[in-house]
Curated annotation (Swiss-Prot):
This is Erlin-1. The gene is ERLIN1. Keywords: Acetylation, Cholesterol metabolism, Disease variant, Endoplasmic reticulum, Glycoprotein, Hereditary spastic paraplegia, Lipid metabolism, Lipid-binding, Membrane, Neurodegeneration, Signal-anchor, Steroid metabolism, Sterol metabolism, Transmembrane, Transmembrane helix. Pfam families: Band_7. Residues 339-348 have a biased composition (Polar residues). Residues 325-348 are annotated as: Disordered. The lineage of its organism: Eukaryota, Metazoa, Chordata, Craniata, Vertebrata.
Length: 348
């Protein structure tokens, strides 16, 4: 063997070793686990992140993600209970595989477990949902419930079939429906929108009317309360005036009563005093005192009898009667007026 052949052999050996090393060394990313197959059999020891060595061409590996990942299911057909075929453009399933469940799930469902456990299950559950509802319900009324219903159905089956695989969320895009039906739905939605706007306007008007009514009620109650307070104030003022008047009347009545009582008492005392004072002897004394103090002299037949004693009065009347009988009358002594006139005429 010459030098050239030796060099070629060494180069071949080095190349073979390099190829073997390249084939045996592999890298696992963070958030992944490596499962190994040797001769088609799954090995029981997954490897974590980092560089690892395996037997080239005999042992193979698959990287399995153990962090959150999103699987997309596209263009899923769905037939409603009315016979209308619709298509859902995309369904996103956010899931996470626990590291402790990697070996069992890969052994039972292969490293492409998501196709078996998620994709096929999505098709089945979605068709079950659509076949039980009408297009109106799927497209409008119950569309907001599809996400939650799919999530619950998937998680319920996974808890039995693949413990450790958790569904975090399901997002479903709006279904694609035939163009004619879509236009009808758009028109219907437009009419619904107009109806909702009209209903909201009516509610606003009713609310404003209710607000105005409440304002009017509050204003009326305020006016009524003010009037009531003023009325009560006037009533209190009148009651106060009445009370003052009653007090003044009572005081005046008490004063007048006391005055009348005093006058009555004084008159009663005066009468009692006069009763004891005005005896016949005292009255006789006062009469003579009055006569003695009187300077007037009365002549004629009309002298008051009250100033003459009764015995003297009788004697005076008898004397006067006798005198009048002895004297001629005045008419006889004096000539009458006619005789005097006749004598004057005869004389002339």
């Amino acid at each position: 063997m010459n030098m050239t052949q030796a060099r070629v052999l060494v180069a071949a050996v080095v190349g073979l070793v390099a190829v073997l090393l390249y084939a045996s060394i592999h890298k696992i990313e963070e958030g992944h686990l490596a499962v190994y197959y040797r001769g088609g059999a799954l090995l029981t020891s997954p490897s974590g992140p980092g560089y690892h060595i395996m037997l080239p061409f005999i042992t193979t590996f698959r990287s399995v993600q153990t962090t959150l990942q999103t699987d997309e299911v596209k263009n899923v057909p769905c037939g409603t209970s009315g016979g209308v075929m619709i298509y859902i453009d995309r369904i996103e399933v956010v899931n996470m595989l626990a590291p402790y469940a990697v070996f069992d799930i890969v052994r039972n469902y292969t490293a492409d477990y998501d196709k078996t456990l998620i994709f096929n299950k999505i098709h089945h559950e979605l068709n079950q949902f659509c076949s039980a509802h009408t297009l109106q319900e799927v497209y409008i009324e119950l569309f907001d419930q599809i996400d939650e219903n799919l999530k619950q159905a998937l998680q319920k089956d996974l808890n039995l079939m693949a413990p450790g695989l958790t569904i975090q969320a399901v997002r479903v895009t709006k279904p694609k429906i035939p163009e004619a039906i879509r236009r009808n739905f758009e028109l219907m939605e437009a009419e619904k929108t107009k109806l909702l706007i009209a209903a909201q306007k009516q509610k606003v008007v009713e609310k404003e009317a209710e607000t105005e009514r409440k304002k009017a009620v509050i204003e009326a109650e305020k006016i009524a309360q003010v009037a009531k307070i003023r009325f009560q104030q006037k009533v209190m003022e009148k009651e106060t005036e009445k009370r003052i008047s009653e007090i003044e009347d009572a005081a005046f009545l008490a004063r007048e009563k006391a005055k009348a009582d005093a006058e009555y008492y004084a008159a009663h005392k005066y009468a009692t005093s006069n009763k004891h004072k005005l005896t016949p002897e005292y009255l006789e004394l006062k009469k003579y005192q009055a006569i003695a103090s009187n300077s007037k002299i009365y002549f004629g037949s009309n002298i008051p009898n009250m100033f003459v004693d009764s015995s003297c009065a009788l004697k005076y009347s008898d004397i006067r009667t006798g005198r009048e009988s002895s004297l001629p009358s005045k008419e006889a002594l004096e000539p009458s007026g006619e005789n005097v006139i006749q004598n004057k005429e005869s004389t002339g």
